[in-house]
């Protein structure tokens, strides 16, 4: 056990929601973050969004949709991505322990989703210099994206795991600003339909275990993954 990254000992309040508008979920995150700063519980929201593109703070103009599709600007890290049906989105609203280690927090989120993939029979891992969870190949294929914000020692935003989503939605953008890699889903990799509901409970358990140190962070890099350019 590597120890919890959370400043609170009580269990994480996991909320399994349905389909929630992106802006509505964003407002809920802010309200929960305010409550957490005031001494409230750590919370994990698990949900789906109606189809929407969201742009992190580092998104450049040429990475936006080529057809002029509207984009919601956010205050998370990272660049542009897509959310929509068939994708499980997780928003941990967590008070981090001192000293703050955001990289360690991101690694724990990655580890939880790597474990979910392993439970399904997929050998996923990391690509050096890039966040998220990847499947090996040339090019490597991203199955889960991560983009977070930490304010007042409290986390917002989180991760998106592609279960059975429309991968064509990613073709209108440069996903996460990475042009030399591909995007995939659990269904595409396994050759069967993997619904959001199938993995909800597994994801919730893995995220809580990783944040509490029960699931240690490993050095998992998929073979034949393409390293990031220097």
Curated annotation (Swiss-Prot):
Active site: residue positions: 176
* Record-level GO BP terms: protein modification process
Query: Which Gene Ontology terms cover its molecular function?
Result: lipoyl(octanoyl) transferase activity
The role this protein plays is: Catalyzes the transfer of endogenously produced octanoic acid from octanoyl-acyl-carrier-protein onto the lipoyl domains of lipoate-dependent enzymes. Lipoyl-ACP can also act as a substrate although octanoyl-ACP is likely to be the physiological substrate.
One Pfam family for this entry, by name? LplA-B_cat
Transferase recorded as keyword = yes
Give GO cellular component annotations, separated by semicolons: cytoplasm
Give UniProt keywords alphabetically: Acyltransferase, Cytoplasm, Transferase
Instruction: Supply the EC number(s).
Output: 2.3.1.181
Q: Which domain of life is it from?
A: Bacteria
Report the protein name in the record: Octanoyltransferase
Q: In which pathway does it act?
A: Protein modification; protein lipoylation via endogenous pathway; protein N(6)-(lipoyl)lysine from octanoyl-[acyl-carrier-protein]: step 1/2
Which annotated residues bind substrate? 76-83, 145-147, 158-160
Compartment(s): Cytoplasm
Miscellaneous comment as given in the Swiss-Prot or TrEMBL entry: In the reaction, the free carboxyl group of octanoic acid is attached via an amide linkage to the epsilon-amino group of a specific lysine residue of lipoyl domains of lipoate-dependent enzymes.
Organism equals Mycobacterium bovis (strain ATCC BAA-935 / AF2122/97)
Site features described as Lowers pKa of active site Cys, chain residue numbers: 142
Q: Which InterPro entries does its entry note?
A: aa-tRNA-synth_II/BPL/LPL (IPR045864), BPL_LPL_catalytic (IPR004143), Octanoyltransferase (IPR000544), Octanoyltransferase_CS (IPR020605)
What broad class of enzyme is this?
transferase
